Amino acid sequence: MSVKVRLGIMMFLQYAIWGSWAPVLAAYLQNELGFNGVQVGVIYSLLPLATIISPFVGGQIADRYFSSEKVIAVLQLIGGVFLLFISQVTDYSTMMWLMVLYCLLYAPTLALTNSIAFINLKDSEKDFGVIRVWGTIGWIAAGWALTGWRVLNVSDTAKGFGGDLLFLAGLFSILMGIMSFTLPHTPPKKGGASPWAFVEAFKMMKNKNFLVFIIISFVVATELMFYYQLTSPFLESERIGLSPQSVPAVMTIAQIAEIFVMALLLPIFIKKYGLRNVLVLGVLAWPLRYIIFAIGEPGWLVIASLALHGFCFVFFFTAAFIYVDTIAPPDIRHSAQSLITFATYGIGNYVGAFFAGWVQDYFTVNGAVNWTGVFIVPCVLTIVCALAFLLFFKEEKSTVKG
């Protein structure tokens, strides 16, 4: 297989794992296991928390000691076994601690898969979006596979579907671990000035422009959790009224839009308008989506607005990883990717998980959620982020690819 095909399969499996459980875990925990809002918030905060801690270890190892593809293989194989076991767990305490361990295994692979792709692509600005889109396809495939399984097992609806979402994620993870041994050999870079690559990555924040980028990325990432954490309960609420069987498939509308935006629009917009303007457009798509959620009707418009996630995610987060790759010195690119992962999927999502939960509780009276109030909050904050980008962020020239 060609390098691009192998990288595409890598992205497909990487995000099929996450896409199997992330969109619908909240509904499973609340409706079937009886977890309360705080407990669900804690479970959702674990991957961001792990992303604060573990990517720098993974990035350091891949930058200085072991080949990236072998690191990913080991982490995914062990992680898959954990997921299969977690799918059978029903009590909160056991699930929480096992999820802590699993998330510590999965989190480093988010940055490492990006790094492998960037290093093995000749023109990352042009080709990365086409490779990364296979991750979105994997996320969609996982959602439809889960919906298909649940439709075929419709007779079990009364007693719930159990941990099927976590079991499916475990199967994808084991397959990813096996496949990772076939990835392009990506050894550590030789000759780095410092043996501590992650320290050098942190020093990039001495650049005021990069510091602005990191801070705003963090704030935007906090608002991402309003989508990940609250969309499935919102769609299953009386206000929208979708069934648990249909929600996984309906939510893939967002990823279908991602495919179009990532594969077709992102390379064109970067070339024509530059990364800075693409990032601003990405932030501006967020308040539009959230204001539609806040209005909450008609139902078809709320469902259609899921497609805006394609612009929200690709034009900001995917473009952000490309930006970091263009400015990071070659010998610390793994750790630089870990730094943006830390700021967004890590501390940003971690704070966002609790913030979204707190906002939901604030706007809940006698068990009834005021969804309008909930979604106005991220709408306002993302408008502020877009204005800050326009005022304070300037695009820089890239480093030499190597």
Question: What do these predicted ranges mean?
Answer:
Residues 53-90:
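Conserved MFS/SLC helix-loop-helix module at the cytosolic interface between two early adjacent transmembrane helices
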Residues 70-84, 277-292:
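Structural signature of the two symmetry-related core transmembrane helices
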Residues 12, 82-86, 92-112, 116, ...:
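Hydrophobic core of transmembrane alpha-helices in multi-pass small-molecule transporters
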